[in-house]
């Protein structure tokens, strides 16, 4: 981006770097703002890492990260607080500098649930506990991420 003429890039699509297991995007907010580049955040569920269903077989994350996220999802289930809800709330409510977050689902009911989660208050104690469970796997990336 440093080598492109100013104004050439209007926005970027970031995925899996502003979610419960990875907040790397925060390190780049000033860079984008200084250049007038808008940010679209995507995949608050980290491509399925942060789901009760579990990580898809094709997911490129390393096993220790998959296992840490599975433990976090199990904890959330035990607490009666779906990790999907916490993940969507975290990605949409904590940082006003990130105005747009995209998520997808093949199930229309899940889309409606995700939309409703945005209007509910975020439980910061749950966020802290989940991030504690993920532990040293926070910000662990995989190829092409």
Question: Where on the chain are the PLM-derived regions?
Answer:
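Beta/alpha (TIM)-barrel catalytic core signal, keyed to glycine-rich beta->alpha loops juxtaposed to Asp/Glu
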Residues: 1-144
